[in-house]
């Protein structure tokens, strides 16, 4: 029988992050979908995460001074333990560090238009992910089929202290090699 010799293609994918529908998980987890992210009105990942009560300001002396390589960074700081103890993943994989010599991720490097959902483990996850996940894990899931163009313009302000803000973002995306790859270009001002 020749049909017994033919192997079917088996694809196994997984994540160590428990899904939100698993309410019996002992680890506290918050999931924000695309609609929830849009409803926040936030213009970047940093502002979205800082809406969570578990997140503290990621600003520290290291990213407010004028040293090369660290000024202007926006990082996440879960449970007040410091951004160096919060692991940031993109699609379940470690993201490049924004500060040379550390694993601290600059959230400015992730275009908001491409985010499908955010998964935040707010309990310690160092036993699964290592010592840089003592405070928790932020997993940013990106859209894998973004094609076309997205234009976003936001205007805001407040009365005290000259608080007018304007943000514009244009994102282009295209599929390559019959859907096996893609390229995305984002401009933000």
PLM regions: where:
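N-terminal periplasmic accessory domains that precede
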Residues: 45-48, 74-77, 106-108, 132-153, ...
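Short strand-turn segments of transmembrane beta-barrel domains in outer membranes
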Residues: 119, 124, 146-174, 185
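Outer-envelope beta-barrel architecture signal
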Residues: 86, 145-149, 179-183
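Short acidic/polar hinge/loop motifs at secondary-structure boundaries
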Residues: 93-122
């Amino acid at each position: 029988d020749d049909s017994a010799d033919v192997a079917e293609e088996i694809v196994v994918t997984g994540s160590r992050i428990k899904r939100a529908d698993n309410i019996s998980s002992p680890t506290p987890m918050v999931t924000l979908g695309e609609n929830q992210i849009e409803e926040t009105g936030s213009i970047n990942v940093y502002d979205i995460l800082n809406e969570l009560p578990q997140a503290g300001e990621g600003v520290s002396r290291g990213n407010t001074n004028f040293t090369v390589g660290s000024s202007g960074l926006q990082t996440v700081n879960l449970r007040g333990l410091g951004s160096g103890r919060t692991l940031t993943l993109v699609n379940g994989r470690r993201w490049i560090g924004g500060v040379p010599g550390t694993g601290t991720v600059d959230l400015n490097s992730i275009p908001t238009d491409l985010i499908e959902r955010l998964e935040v483990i707010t309990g310690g996850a160092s036993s699964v992910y290592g010592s840089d996940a003592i405070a928790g894990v932020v997993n940013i899931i990106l859209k894998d089929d973004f094609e076309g163009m997205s234009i976003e313009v936001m205007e805001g302000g407040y009365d005290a202290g000259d608080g007018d803000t304007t943000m514009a973002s244009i994102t282009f995306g295209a599929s390559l090699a019959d859907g096996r790859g893609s390229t995305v270009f984002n401009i933000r001002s």
